[in-house]
Amino acid sequence: MLLGGGLAVAERLWQQPVRRWFMVLMMIPIFLPPVVVTTSFIATFGTQGIFPLKILYSPVAVVLAYCYYNIPLAYLLLRSAVSRISPATEAAAQLLGANRWQRLTTVLLPQLWIPLLGTAGLIFLYSFTSFILPLQLGSIHGYTLEVWLYQRIYLYHTYGIAMIAALIQLSIIGSVLFIIGRFLRAIMISTVTPEQFGRTQFSFKLISVVYASLIMLPLIGFVVKILSHSTSDDVMTLLNSHFISSLLRTVLVTMLVIFLTTSLVFIGRFGTKGALLLLALSPVTVSFVWYQWFGQGYVSLIGALLMTTLPISMILIQHARQQYAKFFLDTARLLGASWWQRILLEVQLLQPTMRQIVVFGGILVIGDATISSALTPTAQPLAMPYATQLIGSYRFGVGSLALLAILLLIILLSTFSYARRP
């Protein structure tokens, strides 16, 4: 909050314009699967890494990985919230003789406390329910409740104590969501007030370069590690393994989950409460519920993945429907439009949001390693768990190439979806 949100507020106080390249770079960690982040940290900061800092497999590494995700998230959310504040209010305060500190305390903060609380709540929820980051970077010293819960379910099969822990976790997450539920709309990206600011000061340019360098450093280390240590034998091993078939299964499962998600959110009229209810379930809890109901298999896998893609999709579609007036479709009906014509009209209105759902849903499914590793049949794994197994079996070169292929698939999905904008 301090490093990400503080930069967003400081840019407004010093009237710095939005830098498109910086916004794009700050979005990169949000779209990265956790396994890619942990592997990048190992390749860059591990004992055999480019910068062997000897911080891995400790709580410090877990905290740094959380910061890698959440500092950009805080910046983007609060930058959006700040941009919705009219510059005229600050200009009026400045004309009345208010300095920057007074403008911060009397103009900005009173209008930002709701986005601040909402952003803090989301960061807490993400860190509290994270599984892959503490599992791969924390070792036994950095295990969290989510990792402990996973071990009790799938390693020790102590379902009774696992259910009690899951209920405690659910009550904590539910309480946080109940508190920040009314703040979600305030932190969603929407129409902003245009900012007519001048050129960026050198100090903010320098800060932007530092932030961008810290974001790109693990990824660059990951790529350098692949190029320097992967051989042609690794490529042939990957091609002759089950990775290609697992990648094809991942694509098919992703297409099915996205189709079901878009159909459900378009046909249904889900409210924010339904989305919050699903958000209260952590990935390990979701997989545990489906594992108990239907066992291990693709029915459980697709059902659990739907429960992870539906919340963000429900929030996005509800927000989009609020952007156009309800009487718009009523007018079309009064003018004689058939049911099918009204459906096509709403599809046209919601087309940008549908593309966002495809991108977010695809990234969640392709990048998932928690649910898919627990529910996918052992003989038919998906791509991400398979790549994780390769890395865990000390075949780093082959596993890194598999992760790179998955990352390219995510980039292709995002590029294709947004390139179709009219």
Regions found by a protein language model. Give the residues of each.
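Membrane-water interface segments at the C-terminal ends of transmembrane alpha-helices
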Residues: 1-83, 111-138, 164-181, 201-228, ...
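Short hydrophobic faces within alpha-helices
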Residues: 28, 91-94, 162, 319, ...
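Membrane-interface segments at the starts/ends of alpha-helical transmembrane spans
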Residues: 53-55, 148-161, 235-245, 389-394
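Short glycine/proline-centered loop/turn elements that form peptide/ligand docking sites
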Residues: 85-89, 195, 324-328
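Feature of multi-pass inner-membrane transport and sensor proteins
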Residues: 87, 102, 140-146, 175-203, ...
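Short, charged juxtamembrane terminal tails flanking transmembrane helices
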Residues: 95, 418-422
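Glycine/proline-centered hinge or cleavage motifs at structural transition points of membrane proteins
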Residues: 96-98, 110, 335-337
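Glycine-rich helix-loop "coupling/hinge" segments at transmembrane-helix boundaries
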Residues: 132-157, 369-396
